[in-house]
């Protein structure tokens, strides 16, 4: 299932003639970032925040670590606790894709 969330203000932007768009590839994040962060992340956040549409492919499933990996999902089970979403908020993404090859790593409940 793909979930697309567009804020009302984007409808006005889309109806205009130009928008700025930043897209990043797979975010495969399975733990929170260190409190001090990493070198260069603040600059990356500024770059991402400079666009009106900020898209990321969330390659990791987000859940509370209950359940077991689905045995037929391919052997690489991507999972992160919901707390990693707090770190992702720092980068101001406003559009996520969650439909990918890891969507069923923990079956229907994951």
Model-derived regions, located:
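Acidic, metal/ion-coordinating pockets
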Residues: 2-110
